């Protein structure tokens, strides 16, 4: 499972790099850097790198190829270990890695369609949404392989209220990120609100672009407030330190995103801050999805657990009470059972039998 976890982490890293670079392609207007040619760039897989937009677009395509290879390698590794616990079957690494490969192929095909359609906004939005789904599946694969706190989270249950709250947070994050992609691509939406946190007015922008920008902002604000509530609730309930840590990370990223957004508007949308804004948005989606998935699997017993070895009867014989050996081994076992604490509960009948045996031995 350790090897699979490493494969999954590599796939996650390549996926994140590919998504961030895809955001740079949109922000820099390099989506048509290779014209309407796909998969080749002006008839060649290795065109002359003589224009910035061509360099950005072809690098994005190279990263897509590396990503597909990483996903296929993860799938092959999972297939070879399909008989291992936590790999095959429902909730296993094999199924999620297969879904990741399918989504990777779908994203590549949507990229081709987007290029052929001239990089229109809604084709780009569909491509971006599939990419968000892909990174979510890769995150789920990492967690199923025991990464990102997945192994330890399964050992502690969380309430249904916590699970519902984390799912709501992930849904809001996905909507905010998708609307952010539409804001970056829809004509005039990125400059529709010249002020922050208030919108202000831009007479050169149509109403539809303003509505897209405001929807993106309100979703981001509601998400941060919701994550703050999740963190406060977890601090009060003390259900799982891993869930609390994941919620705190998501909240911190949300606050950082608001600060980056304010700086970006105040500095009139410099490309560097726009790229950072997109990268932080992807990070928030990853964090909130991981939080929701960790809460979903908490205490369900799926995936990999540390093996629990039951004590042998010979280990109990002669153990005594308080660490001292006893010459009456069955009496020692009975007294030990009668004085069990709450961490190893006995049924009522077995507890009563243990007490009776202990008293009979005394008499």
Question: For the regions a protein language model found, what residue spans apply to each?
Answer:
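Polytopic transmembrane helical bundles with strong interfacial aromatic enrichment
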Residues: 1-330, 334-336, 343, 353-363
